[in-house]
Structures are given as C-alpha cells and as structure tokens.
Amino acid sequence: MIETYSQPSPRSVATGLPASMKIFMYLLTVFLITQMIGSVPFAVYLHRRLDKVEEEASLHEDFVFVKKLKRCNKGEGSLSLLNCEEMRRQFEDLVKDISLNKEEKKEKSFEMQRGDEDPQIAAHVVSEANSNAASVLQWAKKGYYTMKSNLVVLENGRQLTVKREGLYYVYTQVTFCSNREPLSQRPFIVSLWLKPSSGSERILLRAANTHSSSKLCEQQSIHLGGVFELQAGASVFVNVTEASQVIHGIGFSSIGLLKL
C-alpha cells in the first residue's frame, strides 16, 4: 500500500493595517483638521485683543499724563517730584502739532476748492495824461491798480483785453471839468466801447453831462457800469468828446472789470 503525503500550502501573509490602527489614524486626522480650523479664529481674536489692550494702555498713559499735568497746575508738582516743566513742554509741543495739522488740512482743502473753480480775473487801472489829446483815454498800471490774472491784459495802454470768455462786470469812472468856453455848447460825453475779437466795434454804455458857465473848474464825475458777456480776445476802452477836460490821477478816472 502506497501512502501519499502532500505538504500543506504556506499560509498567506495578511496585508494592510489592523482595524484599530485605521481608527487611530482617522481620529488623529480629524483632530489635526479641527485644530487647524479652530486656530484661525483664535488667532484673529488674539490679534484684536492685543490691539485693544494696547489701545487701553495708551489711553491709560494719556489719562495719567493729564492727571499729572493737572497736579502741576495746582502747584502739587514739587510735592510729587514731577518734572512739571518737561510735561508742560511736551503738552505745548502736542498742541502745536495739532494746530499745524489743522492748518495744513485747511490749506489743502482750500487749494483743492480753488483748483476746482475758475481762476479769478479782475483788473483796475487809472487814467494817464495823453499829450496827443486823443479821444480814447490812456490807462496805466500805477497807484492803486489791480491785475489779478494773466487772463486779462492792458494793451497799448488803451484797452483791457480778456483771454477767457464769460460774464464780466465792466465799469469806468471819468472825472472832468464841466466849465466850457461860451461858444462851446456840446455836452461832455463818455462812451464805454466794446471791441470784439472779430467784428465791428460797438458802444456798451454812454452818458453825458451839460456844461457849466463857471470859469473855474467844477469837477464832476460820470460813472458807467454793467454786466456783459465777453468772448475771448474781446477788449473794452473809453472814448470822450473832449479829452482835455479829463482830470487824471488816482481816484479821479479809472476803468476796470471783474469776471463773475
């Protein structure tokens, strides 16, 4: 009888982690993720809390400084051994810094407002004697004169020319002697003329004054003024019937304009 013997097959080696190890790794992963998520709001809270603590500490220092300053003003500085002079100097420097900051803000605000607005245009010139005795009056930048902007110029000493269009208040005052020769009966006439950049000249305003029989110079003044729309390059000038009767000098005869 032949007996056969079969060798048992080797047992297969188990692969993979045990179930307990898998559970441990899962719990560890959940814990780490939870800790990471929870640390973010905690860090934000801690940062805000530190800022608040610093602010409270600063306020406390300010309160202590003010309290010490009050004690100095009450004459208790020598008793508490406080350096009152140093504290007063620090307080004065602080007040100066605050005042300077306010002034700088006001200046910046004013400059911004001025930048948004149109530049101010104004002119005022006084009469000047003309040896030619021309009917168009001569003007000069002397005495109490004004040339507020380079957008208005005095051309040829006779006319004010604007370089920007807009509404302008234009005025003139002419002072003259009202006495006349017996044969001359013409009134003294003052005319404010407009010379546009293109086109013919025209009268804006006109006024007249009758003569006087007095042989002495009786000073009289004619004032003309009105609001007109002037184009860029337009000019204004004054014409009189008898230039020899005009009285020149500061306060007597003048012409001016102001952009509204």
From Swiss-Prot:
Disulfide bonds: C177-C217
TM spans (from-to): 23-43
Site entry: Cleavage: E111, M112
Subcellular location: Cell membrane; Cell surface
Residue ranges that the UniProt entry lists as topological domain Extracellular: 44-260
Annotated membrane topology: Single-pass type II membrane protein
SUPFAM superfamilies per UniProt: TNF-like
Highest rank taxon of the organism: Eukaryota
Residue stretches making up the THD domain: 121-260
Major subcellular site: membrane
The record's account of how the chain is modified after translation: The soluble form derives from the membrane form by proteolytic processing.
Cytoplasmic topology ranges: 1-22
Carbohydrate-modified residues: N239
Family per record: Belongs to the tumor necrosis factor family.
Quaternary data: Homotrimer. Interacts with CD28. CD40 ligand, soluble form: Exists as either a monomer or a homotrimer. Forms a ternary complex between CD40 and integrins for CD40-CD40LG signaling.
The protein's name: CD40 ligand
Gene that encodes the chain: Cd40lg
